[in-house]
């Protein structure tokens, strides 16, 4: 039995008259391409397309809820549809050449793109005359109607060169040029370089055979790199307006979100110094010291003074952090006999995090 004011719930009526149906359709297609050019050039590329459509139909019968017919939960019908697609591609050109037996050169150029779009609509009505009339079009009153759409694009261009001399010295350099539509229009593109070098000491002529039996491998490496981070979301930097009912007798809107044209990338600079050793063909030792500093930290939903006309910023660049420390790892092959092997490993680390510059809104935010 269903109560007149919704005090009771009728599971039988829900099972027989109510429904919640979802249909999902996914499609994915990928095309790859390969071609070997003259002069040691190789081309590799792929394009991938992904599409998804989802439809949801729901009906909440009044016979199950027992509410009055003027309630929003009386014969409530909902239809919702969403469509999304993404298109990705990667194009890579490689060059690999050995000169004079000791000089090796590898160059790589990569171009990546990503684009995604999605739309969704939903409408809900209530007060349908009968549980047999479950389409929202038949509803006597609108419970809600929503629609949304978003679009995002990214592009990355990467160039890398690696030089190897006699397997003793390795030098590499990389440049990343990135663009992201979620950034402010004044800082949509950024460039981040990196470089590194390595010295295989055990391949030097002064590394005697006797010493090589004790220290089988020895390498020194160093690197310096800059990287960037963009905000999540499709278009949070856009300004937005929202309805506020009426002003006097006319419809009214107000600015609800500030435009962020000057939003910047969160940038990180990191350098690393490392050592790799292998002793007696059993013990591997890896030592690393790193120093990292992050500036223009991205903070989300930052509260600001109400005198600005806004309650918060969707994103803000403020503050900086430093992170430095030391890591050590040891791997020892206890047993290496035919198909049997036993390895024991241990590691130790010390990490120091420090807030170099406090966020500008520190006194306004509630930190716990």
Q: Model-flagged regions — what are they?
A:
Residues 1-60, 71-368:
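Extracellular/periplasmic, surface-exposed regions of secreted and cell-surface proteins
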């Amino acid at each position: 039995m269903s109560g007149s004011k919704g005090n009771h719930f009728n599971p039988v009526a829900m099972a027989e008259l109510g429904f919640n149906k979802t249909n999902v359709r996914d499609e994915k297609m990928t095309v790859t391409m390969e071609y070997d050019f003259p002069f040691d050039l190789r081309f590799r590329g792929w394009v991938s397309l992904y599409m998804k459509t989802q439809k949801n139909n729901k009906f909440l019968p009044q016979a199950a809820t027992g509410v009055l017919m003027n309630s929003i939960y009386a014969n409530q019908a909902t239809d919702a549809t969403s469509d999304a697609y993404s298109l990705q591609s990667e194009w890579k050109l490689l060059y690999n050449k050995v000169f004079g037996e000791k000089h090796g050169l590898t160059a790589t150029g990569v171009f990546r793109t990503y684009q995604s779009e999605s739309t969704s609509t939903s409408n809900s009505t209530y007060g349908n005359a009968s549980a047999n009339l479950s389409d929202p079009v038949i509803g006597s009153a609108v419970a809600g109607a929503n629609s949304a759409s978003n679009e995002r694009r990214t592009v990355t261009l990467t160039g890398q060169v690696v030089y190897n001399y006699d397997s003793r010295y390795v030098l590499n350099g990389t440049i990343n040029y990135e663009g992201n539509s979620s950034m402010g229009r004044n800082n949509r593109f950024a460039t981040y370089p990196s470089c590194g070098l390595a010295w295989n000491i055990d391949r030097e002529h002064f590394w005697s055979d006797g010493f090589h039996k004790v220290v089988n491998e020895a390498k020194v490496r160093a690197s310096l790199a800059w990287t960037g981070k963009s905000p999540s979301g499709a278009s949070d930097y856009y300004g937005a307006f929202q309805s506020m009912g009426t002003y006097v007798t006319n419809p009214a809107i107000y600015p609800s979100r500030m435009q962020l044209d000057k939003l910047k990338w969160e940038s990180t600079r990191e350098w690393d110094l490392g050592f790799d050793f292998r002793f007696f063909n059993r013990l591997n030792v890896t030592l690393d010291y790193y120093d990292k500093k992050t500036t223009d930290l991205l903070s989300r939903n930052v509260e600001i003074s109400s005198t600005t006309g806004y309650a918060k910023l969707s994103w803000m660049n403020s503050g900086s952090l430093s992170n430095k420390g030391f890591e050590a790892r040891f791997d020892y092959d206890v047993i290496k006999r035919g198909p049997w092997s036993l390895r024991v490993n241990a590691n130790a680390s010390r990490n120091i995090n420090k807030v170099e510059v406090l966020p500008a809104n520190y006194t306004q935010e509630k930190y716990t």
